[in-house]
Amino acid sequence: MGDTFIRHIALLGFEKRFIPSQHYVYMFLVKWQDLSEKVVYRKFTEIYEFHKMLKEMFPIEAGEIHTENRVIPHLPAPRWFDGQRAAESRQGTLTEYFNGLMGLPVKISRCPHLLDFFKVRPDDLKLPTDSQAKKPETYLVPKDGKNNVADITGPIILQTYRAIADYEKSSGTEMTVATGDVVDVVEKSESGWWFCQMKTKRGWVPASYLEPLDSPDEAEDPDPNYAGEPYVTIKAYAAVEEDEMSLSEGEAIEVIHKLLDGWWVVRKGDITGYFPSMYLQKAGEEITQAQRQIRGRGAPPRRSTIRNAQSIHQRSRKRLSQDTYRRNSVRFLQQRRRPGRPGPLSTDGTKDNPSTPRVKPQPAVPPRPSSDLILHRCTESTKRKLTSAV
């Protein structure tokens, strides 16, 4: 797995789901070595199967050979009929279990089995749709409660943002915010939907409705990459604003600027424009996984379309115009298409190689003088020798 490892794990709570049948899943916030934070959902039966496999991989540390050598914590088996009370009471057990695992030597705490278990799966990104008859019920661990044992491996510092306008949720997985509300951002999804918490509420909020407290600019926005990354559209989109781009499904484009609000700058030929990142998939990857992610949720609104936005900052956000993107993009493409400039040439027309030692040139050989010139300029002795030789 290289240098990949998990820094922290926090238990956020659990969900009661009804599709395909009633069951419970636990919500974990996982912080990786690159400081990225992801929310994953796992059933207790999955966690227990993970535990059994871990014991098989490390029988000595599991106490299978000698009980006194056991360091892997105990995890009780699931019951036949688990209800909401059992799901709630089990949160403390899970916290202690993963707290114990993360404190073990790296051969266990960073083993591929543990890392793979907490990797984001397609189902973790598949949010319930409004068409579902009964939506999941979320039960959160109190943020400041006395029995808050959700923090498994240490504090996870969440970034704080402020809402610049009222946003009314349109589904059960979103969260309503009012102008001036301060929220903690749990996860920044590339789609432009951020998972936030405010007191005992959690849900998805469009990133365009949020601003940092210390600056109007998003410090984590990367710089443009005019070399471009190849992507494919997995859903058609018709431009609404002048600086957006209309594309059909299945078109190949290049992404030149990935912005955290979920509206990326893409390039098609020499044309650039904004396009929803939710409708893009990296070229060469399975499209079916990305299509699962966009079901039941549309592209987030752009900040330019928000009415009555009220920022606490005096200056507005710094944004490049599409004219600037196009101009810089065209300049980059022209330089890329231009053949390489020849290096300095030597007198014989060949390129000089700086790594090759230079040889001093030999002096030029003068042309041989003619016989008449020799007879005219030579001495009498030389004339007699030349005359006798003829």
From Swiss-Prot:
Gene3D superfamilies the UniProt entry points to: Phox-like domain, SH3 Domains
PROSITE patterns the UniProt entry points to: PX, SH3
Membrane topology: Peripheral membrane protein
Modification sites for Phosphoserine: 304, 321, 329, 346
GO molecular function: phosphatidylinositol binding; phosphatidylinositol-3,4-bisphosphate binding; SH3 domain binding; superoxide-generating NAD(P)H oxidase activity; superoxide-generating NADPH oxidase activator activity
Subunit note: Component of the phagocyte NADPH oxidase complex composed of an obligatory core heterodimer formed by the membrane proteins CYBA and CYBB and the cytosolic regulatory subunits NCF1/p47-phox, NCF2/p67-phox, NCF4/p40-phox and the small GTPase RAC1 or RAC2. Part of a cytosolic complex composed at least by NCF1, NCF2 and NCF4. Interacts (via C-terminus) with NCF2 (via the C-terminal SH3 domain). Interacts with NCF4. Interacts with CYBB. Interacts (via the second SH3 domain) with CYBA; interaction is phosphorylation-dependent. Interacts with NOXA1. Interacts with ADAM15. Interacts with TRAF4.
The protein's name in its UniProt record: Neutrophil cytosol factor 1
Gene (UniProt): Ncf1
